Amino acid sequence: MSKVLILKSSILGDYSQSGQLVEHLKQHWEQQGAEISVRDLAAEPLPMLDGEIASGLRGGDQLSARQEQALLLSDSLIQELKAHDTIVIAAPMYNFSIPTQLKNWIDLVARAGVSFTYTETGPKGLITGKRAVLITTRGGVHKGGASDHVVPYLKTVLGFIGIEEVETVYSEALNMGPEASKQGIESAQQALEKIVA
């Protein structure tokens, strides 16, 4: 049975377009018997990386209570990642980048010696044998252009920790009028259905 981890990062709650697409994908996977876990990074935000937490994530025997909590949380998030076959990341474009809530997750998951390591030939990801599906929503049209920092960044991060099989579903032009928005959602839904098929 396939195990799927869904990461939601929109701050818009029930009004989230990326959330609607995630739900569409989730329903299709559930019909196939997939085991699905959902982590809503906006509804249950993770701590933002600062100097104290960054130092604590390196470990040690003289950690503050806050550092110990962050280290345990990071370990838990990485184990959660390892326990699933497919990782779905819903990443709306906010000001040409990803939501802060998703960046917080990345900062807790990307850990030297745990999710990646440095070798003589360069960095090597340690979370392998997974695939990722990126669902990215945006008000305008940015796919493949210089203004799209979302997909290249996420692919780089995922590859860095070992997840190199990445499929991307774009839902664009969502703020460019009702017809364009409808088409942007429907084309993304069709692309998601092909992934599940």
Swiss-Prot record:
Keyword Nucleotide-binding: no
Reaction it catalyzes: 2 a quinone + NADH + H(+) = 2 a 1,4-benzosemiquinone + NAD(+); N,N-dimethyl-1,4-phenylenediamine + anthranilate + 2 NAD(+) = 2-(4-dimethylaminophenyl)diazenylbenzoate + 2 NADH + 2 H(+)
EC number: 1.6.5.-, 1.7.1.17
Chain sites annotated for binding FMN: S10, S16, Q17, S18, M93, Y94, N95, F96, T137, R138, G139, G140
GO MF annotation: an example: oxidoreductase activity, acting on NAD(P)H as acceptor
Pfam family, one: Flavodoxin_2
SUPFAM superfamilies for the chain: Flavoproteins
Cofactor annotation: FMN
Xref: InterPro entries: Flavodoxin_fold, Flavoprotein-like_sf, FMN-dep_NADH:Q_OxRdtase_AzoR1, NADH:quinone_OxRdtase_FMN_depd
Keywords: Flavoprotein, FMN, NAD, Oxidoreductase
Top-level EC class as recorded in UniProt: oxidoreductase
Cofactor: record remark: Binds 1 FMN per subunit.
Family label: Belongs to the azoreductase type 1 family.
Annotated function: Quinone reductase that provides resistance to thiol-specific stress caused by electrophilic quinones. Also exhibits azoreductase activity. Catalyzes the reductive cleavage of the azo bond in aromatic azo compounds to the corresponding amines.
Assembly notes: Homodimer.
Protein name in UniProt: FMN-dependent NADH:quinone oxidoreductase
Gene: azoR
